[in-house]
Amino acid sequence: MSEISDAEKRRILREKRQQKFNKGGASSRLAKITGQTENSFLSTESPLDSRESTYPAQETKAPAGNEDSTKQMDELLAKATSKTTSKASSPPGSAEQQNGNPELDLFAQIAKLQQNANNETVSTDPSGTPDIFAQLMASMQQDEAKGGSPGATAQQPIDPAIVEAHNIAVNKLKSYTILVKWLFFLLPYLYYITHSARDPFQHNAVNYVLDRSNFFTVFTTFEIVALSVYYQLLMSAEKSHNVNTLDNNSKILKLVSMVPPGLVPIPNLRGKVAQALQYWDVVSMYLTDLCFAIVLAGLFQYYHSM
């Protein structure tokens, strides 16, 4: 005979143990195990003696009422589906009267609050739920159109080669402006007014310009005209290259652009700083020319006195 497998051995032992329990005597065995006497106050009756006799396990069959429970579940699912369909076909206003789904009621209340706050029409999807993401996208597009968002004021990145070519053109323009200004007007003018022995001209206007007491008036007027011409040429160069010289070269303006909006209680901080830097550029060019003019006037005066 072939050896009995372990599973078969366990099954046989389990059946023998079950038969022993079915014969009774479980209460006496429990009393022996716990060491209790017959007159003990504690109950020594085993539940194995009180249950009905068991039989070997048989194949399980589906209960007779399973079909009834299945029918009931089908009816419940059909009712739930009909309720969902009726809610989807009902208008958005009727969602407030139906308390079956609290999530839909919550979305409806949020939509009503948004309507009262913004006085705008709330777009809803076919199920009656407000499309909040569509509203957010629409508000962002409106902000970008009005220029209120931070991204609306940000400039598009410019090719560094174009910026470098623009800077070279601006430096050439500034050099040519300084060269023409000093070579054709300031140097001859300073040389002549510092000369002590000079003959007066017949025109009073020329004599007024060459008068030493009118030096600052004539110098300031000439600087205003020269700087105006320079800035007109600079603006035309910026327009042709589509590059803002101050935005791409000023480190101060770049640092100001890094300040988050609302941190400093000054509206349009970047624009005001840019305007101040433009004014400072004009004043610095005027003061530089004035300092060089005073130094050259002293040198020419010393040369004429020799």
Curated annotation (Swiss-Prot):
Transmembrane regions listed in the UniProt entry: 173-193, 215-234, 282-302
GO CC annotations on file: endoplasmic reticulum membrane; GET complex; Golgi membrane
Top-level lineage group: Eukaryota
Subcellular location: Endoplasmic reticulum membrane; Golgi apparatus membrane
Biased composition annotated in UniProt, kind: Polar residues: 34-57, 91-100
Annotated segments matching region Disordered: 1-100
Stretches assigned to the Lumenal side: 194-214, 303-306
InterPro entries: GET2, Get2/sif1
Chief place where the protein resides: endoplasmic reticulum
Coiled coil region boundaries: none
Biased composition (Low complexity): 78-90
UniProt keywords, alphabetically: Endoplasmic reticulum, ER-Golgi transport, Golgi apparatus, Membrane, Transmembrane, Transmembrane helix, Transport
Topology relative to the membrane: Multi-pass membrane protein
One Pfam family from the record: GET2
Disulfide bridge partners, by residue number: none
Compositionally skewed regions (Basic and acidic residues) per UniProt: 1-18, 68-77
Biological process, per Gene Ontology: protein insertion into ER membrane; retrograde vesicle-mediated transport, Golgi to endoplasmic reticulum
Cytoplasmic side of membrane: 1-172, 235-281
Subunit structure: Component of the Golgi to ER traffic (GET) complex, which is composed of GET1, GET2 and GET3. Within the complex, GET1 and GET2 form a heterotetramer which is stabilized by phosphatidylinositol binding and which binds to the GET3 homodimer.
Function: Required for the post-translational delivery of tail-anchored (TA) proteins to the endoplasmic reticulum. Together with GET1, acts as a membrane receptor for soluble GET3, which recognizes and selectively binds the transmembrane domain of TA proteins in the cytosol. The GET complex cooperates with the HDEL receptor ERD2 to mediate the ATP-dependent retrieval of resident ER proteins that contain a C-terminal H-D-E-L retention signal from the Golgi to the ER.
Family: Belongs to the GET2 family.
Protein's recorded name: Golgi to ER traffic protein 2
Native species: Lachancea thermotolerans (strain ATCC 56472 / CBS 6340 / NRRL Y-8284) (Yeast)
